[in-house]
């Protein structure tokens, strides 16, 4: 099996295809500290792309309540259980990825979810329970945890080394050279569901009506027009930013994605130990048990939390974070000028100019021209 360089685990690993990165790679950053699980992103995606027959339980975008929420049920605890206990040595992953762990003849470690695992999309299930019942074959095991929780928004990761691409016997799944978006050719797909079994994040879905698999297409018609996807532009919490990140050896500091991912390392991949090099990155929640965050986001979680807590002291960092939710256009470069952040598209055109701090306006108690006094009604 060929060797590829996965920068997220800081080493080479096995992958069925030779290393070939696209010209540019679509990437997202989600700030978990701001997500309120309003599901606006979920419904925006649902009404745009998956409102047809056979798509009743297809959620290309979903928001889960962690630590006990999943869609499909138990997706992450099940793949982690199959992978077994692994370890990091410093910043290097010393364990096995899903491409290295299986025994022959299997090439990818995975499982096929039961149809009932899709019965509940984890909408509104956000309560931390006092008592966790530990019973046979129950997904939730272990001691009662302190009352903390957070919301995890999930879409297809458009991975650099997609398990779905590696698993498809029909070669119906491909990664676009121009932007790194992973798509399924539905004319070639025969519905074998090997992509569903192989993807550790369980983001390909099988349509029982059309008998083919479907997945997030990253709203590529909008991307091709220089606009961010539906789930990003409709987010009322302004937790999302989409752009294109550079290759690990060609980082551009004035690119907000590169700055947050490669320079500051405040945005981290979800379960990097799985080995797919996902391209959806998360700013971890600051109030969650660090052991849980390290398992989910890797050994950089501690540093990321500290950076976020002290972000107000870093003008460049605040400048990049201020771009979240402030424009529908894709920001290619940015710079901080005075107390404002200015974002530019790929052609160098200014598309957004926002203050680092929201201005405060105090209206006068009296309008001198008319002599009228103003009163607050709130």
Go through each PLM region and give its residues:
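Non-ligating segments of multi-cofactor redox enzymes
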Residues: 1-378
